Amino acid sequence: MSETPRVLLVGAGAVGQVFGKYLQAAGCELSFLVKEKYADEARRGFTLYELGMLEKDLEPVVFSGFGVHVSNEEVAARRWDQVWLCVSSTALRAGSWVGELARATGDATWVMLQPSLDDRDWLLQWIPAERLVSGMIPFISFHAPLKPGERFPKPGTAFWMPPMTKGPFSGPSERLPRVIRTLRAGGYPARASQDVARDVAIPSAVLTVFVNGLEAAGWSFERFLQHDSLERVHRAAREAVQVAASHTKGSASAVLPLLRPALFKLMLPIAARLTPFDLETYLKVHFTKVGEQTRLMMKTYVDLGRRAGLPVEHLLPAH
Ligand SMILES: NC(=O)c1ccc[n+]([C@@H]2O[C@H](COP(=O)([O-])OP(=O)(O)OC[C@H]3O[C@@H](n4cnc5c(N)ncnc54)[C@H](OP(=O)(O)O)[C@@H]3O)[C@@H](O)[C@H]2O)c1
């Protein structure tokens, strides 16, 4: 393993660019593996905006100075210490590229960030547990502007790290410390966790059902907060939380009493007020982009719930 970690980020979208910025700041030798259609844009470099809590003029920051690859052959010609998967859960399963990339990247540590309940099990087909680190994405990033008239001097990727946030990572003791050390050296607030999959399973279940309900309400907070919509979402969220707890051998007992329609009524306006961007528009834009992933995750709750003999009737798609 080299002193300067050689890092390959798969996917140079909203998330890949942000992790790339921190890893480059840590001194990593950085490359992206992108689809051919994005290669020119990536080679020109990206424009980043870091959002704070205060509304002030935004300074675009140029993010460049990394390699750009478009094929496994190019990747296989180099040695890698870390491979970061910055794509959706559905992109992981599209074709056979993950297995091929695993063969092209030798003994590298793989860092997965995907949210679906069975992503880790799925990846273990190709990457042994001794080399697989799991992380959760605590920031929000998006292509800016989200809508016309916003305060960005030119198009780019905006990101917001909520105050006091720590991004959890878990994995084998021989690999995890180096990933965390590297991120911290770049100024990223990383922390070690016993089991990220378990930490995030329940919040992710609530978020997924919420997003599914918001989509059914036409991405409108006002319509989402109406009685019938809230009732449906709260029942489905209870089922998803129980599936998530059962699958990760965790407990839902502390969360279930809190899961009430009133919780969404209370939290949504607070969240909208705290975010330094238009939350309603972000949710619509982002979760339309990863809509297939939300459907995959909903189906996964149903499949795993049925297998475990748990109720799933409110998680089923409406006909
Ligand atoms: N952005 C956020 O605020 C945020 C927050 C928390 C979690 N996440 C999660 O992070 C994941 C990525 O989100 P994102 O916002 O970064 O999405 P994104 O902006 O769409 O970026 C993903 C990029 O990876 C590309 N890609 C897909 N398969 C690839 C492959 N085999 N090789 C190389 N590139 C590939 C995609 O291409 P195409 O455009 O052709 O699909 C896209 O350019 C999702 O699971 C999302 O739910 C995102």
Model-based region annotation:
Residues 1-59, 182:
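NAD(P)+-binding Rossmann beta1-loop-alpha1 motif at the extreme N-terminus of oxidoreductases
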Residues 153-167, 217-226, 277-288:
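Helix-loop-beta segment of a Rossmann-like dinucleotide-binding subdomain
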Residues 16, 172, 176, 229-237, ...:
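Generic structural signal for well-ordered, non-membrane alpha-helical segments
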Residues 11, 34, 87, 114, ...:
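Short beta-strand/turn micro-motifs composed of small residues
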Residues 116-203:
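Rossmann-fold dinucleotide-binding core
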Residues 196-241:
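Active-site-proximal catalytic alpha-helix in oxidoreductases
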Residues 238-319:
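NAD(P)-dependent Rossmann-like dehydrogenase/reductase catalytic/cofactor-binding core
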Residues 60-153:
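Rossmann-like NAD(P)(H) cofactor-binding subdomain of soluble oxidoreductases
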